[in-house]
Design a protein with these regions (language model features):
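Accessory nucleic-acid engagement/destabilization modules that flank
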Residues: 2-217
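Hydrophobic anchor at the beta1->P-loop junction of P-loop NTPases
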Residues: 271
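Conserved RecA-like ASCE ATPase "motif II neighborhood" in helicase/translocase motors
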Residues: 334-403, 583-586
């Protein structure tokens, strides 16, 4: 036994971390506090005046002098100074987790362990949401903090009014993240000692840990929340995954906005990027930085993806309301500032028909600009829906004309996706360039130098303006670095190979997905059990299916019941409308542009593997009918492409067994699909 009587040093080759003479004095203050509001060695922390520690915390620009927060810190500082005696290591208070837009109460580095500690002041029980929260913090460090990839992380939840601990067990998952320990205050020290006794390994390099890069890949909802809360600039840098690409592009767009404002210019920018590079993130950054209605450079992000707009607006509105309540302020009834800078493009377009006035926004961002309608599609819509005959503009022409009503200056930012099929009635990005060339010579064009690539289908149109006045090609308007999910970078290639019936390529790509589990099953209950087991913390899981999957009803999957994407994506585990309940299935229309961590992809007879290729079907009346139109076949194939690429961390594919007694669901409709997927190498759940 060690002289301190706490640790059996024979079991710990790295020595006793309770009474050893290890020193962290050589860690510079800059490193210590780079991600935390306060950082010091445990010895320095214990000897410091509590008022001086509180003063350092209160100096942070994000500090909010809420009475409850102040009281919590005072209590936590006193508690930690008392309970960390004879322990050596590093301590951080209010450690920032940018992806989640929040901070960990305490991070402790002792021996081979990173302890992630969260207090729930005044709580007598261990709420599931609180357990998930501290678990999420540990998972975030494990996945995105480089020096935490190979270390043991132990989350500890302290309910300050609890009388008994809920869980003192040490249970680790394969990646070294332990299940949260749930303790009352008197059990905190024992939990630390128990973990140090039972977790072996080399001591942490505490300097390296402090210096290590944090490289998160946020979902679009997480990114929007952080950008809105932090007003853009700093938050977007946190998401840059160690690359300068996003920051450089965002800075260039800000320069063009300022130049247009100062010099009374009208500018249209075309931003390109590889799939998953963060084009929408840049658009959100512009919109959130210029979100205030009284800002002369007020901006709006426009998207034709209705569910995406609804989910983003609801997420930001909920966060803003929570922030106000935390500060003791009451949200204004009926007020929704988020609506001012994230809108559906069709609502924006409709405003242009109401009067001759310019839009309220001088900066307008069009997401997926290549999906704007052609002149024929726009004219047909205007005639049928708006009673406007003989409409002569394409949607790009009409939208530019609306923004051009500003007499002084304006900026349009077109976010351009490449490599995507142009659907019926969509004009492609070339229509925007052509509209400026033919109708708006007073507008200058700043074009990504990559817009000439074949995947953007604009080469011919770009050629007509290449030497024109007021046309500038800019390398900084291309995002070259993918920010796809940390586990899912090869998933799109795998799905493409599966859908293109390239078996060998699919097998090879599947072998690269060693951190992205994929399974198939004929049993829906097994699929549900699988995602519930795989998910940790608040990782979201959900049930998804094709909008043409009409014969999953015997499995209680009825896609005709419209799922509300706001509740499905944002609500918690106790809400029956949330994805967690695995009762409501979302279709490709509700999930496009959004993600879950774990998905159950339900496969129906609308898209069947047959022989050496796919068979396409639409359920009409009481039977399946063949889909012969090539365009509609492509829609169906792309629906499954969307479904199979929605999960960030893994998925299980549910292929029903069918029913010989049901002519709409014979086993033959499903067996060949299941066999094809199994032959590729996807593991089978039995």
């Amino acid at each position: 036994m060690c002289p301190c009587q706490f640790i059996n040093t024979a079991a710990l080759p790295w020595a006793c971390w309770i009474c050893s003479n290890f020193s962290v004095a050589n860690l510079t203050p800059a490193l210590i506090v780079s991600r935390a509001w306060y950082g010091a060695s445990i010895a320095e922390f214990r000897s410091a005046d509590p008022n001086s520690i509180f003063g350092i915390l209160a100096k942070d620009p994000e500090f909010d002098l809420a009475t409850t927060q102040k009281g919590a810190w005072v209590e936590q500082i006193a508690f930690l100074q008392k309970n960390l005696d004879r322990l050596n290591g590093m301590l951080y208070l209010e450690f920032n987790i940018p992806r989640m837009g929040s901070r960990v109460d305490v991070v402790l580095l002792i021996g081979p362990v990173v302890f992630v500690v969260e207090f729930k002041v005044g709580e007598a029980s261990f709420a599931r949401a609180a357990v998930d929260q501290v678990w999420d913090y540990a998972l975030d460090l494990k996945n995105f903090h480089e020096a935490s990839h190979q270390v043991s992380l132990v989350p500890i939840l302290i309910a300050t009014e609890a009388k008994e601990p809920a869980s003192m067990k040490l249970t680790a998952d394969v990646d070294g993240v332990y299940r949260p320990m749930q303790v009352h205050p008197e059990g905190f020290r024992a939990a630390i000692e128990y973990a140090l006794e039972n977790i072996s390994g080399d001591a942490l390099d505490q300097r390296q840990w402090a210096q290590a890069a944090y490289k998160p890949t946020p979902t679009i909802v997480e990114a929007a929340r952080a950008l809105y809360a932090h007003h853009g600039v700093q938050a977007i840098k946190a998401f840059d995954a160690g690359k300068k690409n996003l920051s450089t592009t965002s800075r260039r767009i800000e320069e063009l906005i300022e130049e247009a404002r100062v010099k009374n210019r009208k500018i249209i920018c075309f931003l390109t990027g590889v799939p998953g590079a963060g084009k929408t993130l840049v658009g959100l950054n512009v919109a959130t930085q210029h979100a205030r209605a009284d800002n002369p450079t007020h901006a709006v992000l426009l998207s034709g993806n209705g569910p995406l707009v609804a989910v983003l607006r609801a997420a930001l509105f909920r966060d803003e309301r929570a922030r106000l309540r935390k500060r003791g302020l009451k949200p204004k009834t009926g007020s929704d500032p988020v609506k001012q800078f994230i809108q559906n493009v069709h609502h924006f377009r409709d405003e242009a028909l109401k009067s001759e006035a310019p839009p309220a926004d001088h900066v307008v961002v069009f997401d997926e600009a290549q999906r704007a309608w052609s002149q024929a599609m726009t004219a047909d819509f205007m005639k049928r829906k708006k009673g406007v005959p003989n409409f002569s503009d394409s949607e790009p022409q009409f939208l530019i004309r609306y923004v051009d009503r500003h007499k002084d200056w304006a900026v349009i930012l077109c976010l351009v996706g490449g490599g995507q099929e142009i659907n019926r009635g969509e004009s492609g990005i070339g229509a925007w360039v052509e509209a400026v060339r033919t109708s708006f010579p007073n507008w200058d064009m700043y074009i990504s130098s990559r817009l000439t690539d074949s995947e953007y289908a604009a080469t011919a149109t770009i050629g007509t303006v290449q030497e024109s006045r007021g046309v500038y090609f800019d390398d900084n308007l291309h995002l070259a670095v993918s920010m796809r999910s940390f586990r899912a970078e090869h998933v799109s290639a795998f799905v493409k190979a599966v859908l293109d019936c390239e078996r060998d390529n699919a097998r090879l790509t599947l072998a690269k997905l060693n951190r992205y589990p994929i399974a198939i099953t004929r049993n829906l209950n097994l699929a549900k059990q699988w995602v519930r087991t795989m998910a940790r913390g608040s990782e979201r899981f959900g049930l998804i299916a094709s909008s043409k999957a009409q014969r999953l009803k015997p499995h209680a999957i009825d896609i005709r019941v419209k799922t509300d994407p706001v509740h499905w994506f944002l609500d918690g585990k106790d809400d029956t409308r949330s994805s967690y309940y695995l009762e409501d299935a979302a279709t490709e229309f509700q999930v496009q542009g959004l993600e879950v961590d774990w998905a159950i992809v339900s496969w129906d007879g609308d898209f069947r593997f047959k022989g050496s290729g796919w068979s396409f079907h639409d359920f009409r009346g009481a039977k399946w009918q063949n889909v012969k139109n090539p365009e509609n076949r492509n829609y169906l194939k792309n629906a499954y492409r969307v479904l199979l690429t929605r999960a960030r961390q893994g998925m299980v594919i549910f292929v029903p067994e069918g029913d010989p007694a049901d002519h709409t669901r014979p086993p033959a409709f499903y067996d060949s699909t299941f066999e094809y997927l199994a032959q590729i190498g996807i593991s089978v759940l039995n």
